[in-house]
């Protein structure tokens, strides 16, 4: 069995890790950094860029650059580039493909299996969409695990004794809080809560709005309507936010941000930490509710928690740390890297599934209640939130009208009392019920949640034994045909990327060969015949011409000819130099590494 990798597929950054020699290791990407921006771009020439290259060109190509796609997972949102529409699953798959390729380059072997993390508060549609993205990228997703749980695994791998731990996970786009009990290799989630639309992106937006509103007051121009100016504002806002984690004030300087009839306009302002905290205070305060909810669900008080772990880049913000300290009455633990802990935890779980680690048991929970719609549009819960998974529960229902021969099962997820206020996961019909007065038939509805948190539902008429079951595939999820089409397209992109890399390598080798040949002629030109020089110069020129074109095979062929000509001359010169150094040969005078000797010109054309 090959290596199973652990992937933190984040809103703004992603990270991949693997177990090596019993220790989790974060895998650097091809650019040399340990986290990869979750950014995909398409150049006007149709080339696809992922990660740092995509992020770098965002200012000049904002319309064709896709960021924070994770926020749209499990929805019917589509991104249109030229005439093609992309689903969030496809864009996420491109990020996963990049992480997979980096892992393969690091490990020196093919990678086909992964554990991928999701926010604890992701619903069924979002989890299924993540699994589909993995398949499109060519990965068998062995397990979907919750991000706070993964972070707790990273923290608790080498800890002894029983501890109650709270994980406060505030990333680029999502917020989760989970409470776990850790002891003797068992990681049991007691409760989880969160907000799928809160994170660093929202803090950036507050700075963007502050800058844009002030600029509009002064100049009467709304920069948010100019895509290129808005992208510059986004990058400046993120930079300012990061700097204010360590500095009390930062300067935002954006020359030539726009222009009007009176000339170019610039932004040059200072943002203090106090002002930034004022801008985001309500967002940070909104994390307090889920923390209290999780504590209440776990039946614990803040003083019962032994350690508070901060995960996600946004927890570096001093106001966030102060808020957590205020609620919990203790300093948060700083011993884990907030950007890498989730990927490390995923790698540990991957090693557990691969059989490399034997003494760890992970008991996670379902974040939201599951049930069905019953008479009057009421939501009847079958599995309560924070139930340990995997789990299977059944409940008996009956018909609402006389002689009813079929029932529609409407599956829902959420906490609201009315069906219409909860997330619809799908519907199916159980037919063939024998006619009977209402209230007589007995229909058993069974919910089954697997270890990935993905839901399977069945309904059975106890009188006839007829049953109907579905794995939830809501309206936003992809059909098998769509997934197969996307897998094939992803392979085409992979092939394009491979060819592009190959072309770059061939061009680099050709450049290097020209440099080597020219340097040799410069250093040893007085030892070469004019015919040899002419031959090499001719082949150098052929390679240069080939490099100007797009025919990779022509570059290869020209490089091979230059290589042959160069090799022939080099071999002769080295043999001659070696011969002159032998006793009994011509006595040359050694000058450093250059040997002078008499030699006879052999004309190859004779």
From Swiss-Prot:
GO MF annotations in UniProt: ATP binding; ATP-dependent protein folding chaperone; unfolded protein binding
Domain of life: Bacteria
Compositionally biased intervals (Basic and acidic residues): 597-606
Induction info: By stress conditions e.g. heat shock.
PROSITE patterns attached to this UniProt entry: HSP70_1, HSP70_2, HSP70_3
Keyword Cell division: no
Database matches in Pfam families: HSP70
Phosphothreonine modifications at: 174
Region (Disordered): 576-606
Function: Acts as a chaperone.
Protein name: Chaperone protein DnaK
Organism field: Caldanaerobacter subterraneus subsp. tengcongensis (strain DSM 15242 / JCM 11007 / NBRC 100824 / MB4)
Name of the gene this protein is made from: dnaK
